[in-house]
Amino acid sequence: MERVKERLGVAQKALATLQEVLAETNPTVILRDAAIQRFEYTFEAVWKTGQEFLRSHEGLDVGSPKGTVHGLFQTGYLNARQAELGLKMVDDRNLTSHTYSEGLSGQIFEELPKYATLIGNQSGQ
């Protein structure tokens, strides 16, 4: 339980940094790239929090971000719409790690407010 609280605190701090950059009203390419970087580390903190939560509260051992989303859905912590968005978020996170394209960066940046809202709703922010 204590480990979940620690991870949740890290995830909430990471989310706050993402929300800070998303609040900018006239984002530049540099701000867009900063937001994507903040999304990457926020995502890592969040999925690891979910993984630990499922292990400690539900006895489920999941080894991947998609497994974590599926586990949270199966145990009722996410509804179908949230799980679908969560899986899309995993896919977008994977794309940010393996490719760079101006168009793709713009598309992912447009999705970040939805992802931040989903993360915030699940982490108590």
Locate the predicted segments by residue.
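Solvent-exposed interaction patches of small proteins and small membrane subunits
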Residues: 1-125
